[in-house]
Structure formats: C-alpha cells, structure tokens
C-alpha cells in the first residue's frame, strides 16, 4: 500500500483449488454452497486458522491468534478449516503450502494464517466460437477463471474485433 497506515509486513495471496465433477454428480453449485454454509455456520463468515494448528488437527482459538507472530490483516473468526473444507481440497492446499515453502521459505510456518472459505462458481455452458465470440460480454462466458486469463482473453478478443472492423 502507498498509505503507510495500511502497510504490513505480511503478504496476502490466494490458493485456489478447482474441482471438476463427473457423472453421476448432479449439483456442483449445491456442493459449493454447502461448503460456504458450513463456514458461515461455524464462524459466521470468514474463518482464520494458524497453519500449525491445521497441521496438528486443532482449532485456532482467539488466544492462539492473539499470541501469533503475525497479526491478522483481515477480520475473521478463529476456527478450524478442516471442519469446512473436504479432505481432498484441504490436502491440496496443504501440499501447495509445503511446495511454496521450498521456493519461499517460511510459507509453511506454524504462524502462517489461512483464511477461508471463498467459493467461486463458473458456468461452462455458454457457447463461444473459435474467436471466443458469444452474445455475452466480460467473463460471463465462464471460459476464464482468473484475472490473468480474463485479461489475456480480453486482449485476444479486442484484436479479433479490430481485425473484423478493418476488413
């Protein structure tokens, strides 16, 4: 942040885990909504948990968060993400944190704070042609799932529109 009052020594980043369902799974949106409901049920919203507590299978308490090396930068309720996230998703997050720790030592520190959960929904039902053209504007197509992909998609489509106007 440019504003010194908002600066911290912490780095915030997001780990996204995609889940693609196959038959006979019928309601992927309902599945995601149930995860969000669990989070709200257990913490009233966003839950924060120390990485060390998660690995040890224990809930983070207000006291442990207060004594933590890092001060939370987001408003959240101390809790247990393992009561919200399915095991395979949680295993993927833990595996990624350990992998990041190899290139950014300290990422897998006991005091690293994890916030959750955020559930995103993507619609893959919208038809687009080979030039990514559809009757939809923006990322309503559900083709891109990140800011970088959406940006690249926008540049590509803008070039195609410019080409069609020239010729």
Q: For the regions a protein language model found, what residue spans apply to each?
A:
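An anion/pyrophosphate-binding glycine-rich loop and adjacent beta-alpha core
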Residues: 1-80
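Generic structural hydrophobic/aromatic packing signal, biased to beta-strands
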Residues: 13-17, 51, 114-116, 126-128, ...
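Solvent-exposed, non-transmembrane amphipathic alpha-helical segments
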Residues: 35, 71, 113, 117-120, ...
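Structural signal for hydrophobic packing residues in well-ordered secondary-structure cores
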Residues: 55, 59, 97-104, 158-165
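A glycine-rich dinucleotide-binding beta-alpha-beta segment and adjacent secondary-structure elements
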Residues: 76-144, 151
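A structural preference for long, well-packed, hydrophobic secondary-structure segments
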Residues: 127-132, 159-167
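A conserved FAD-binding loop/helix module that cradles the flavin
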Residues: 140-165
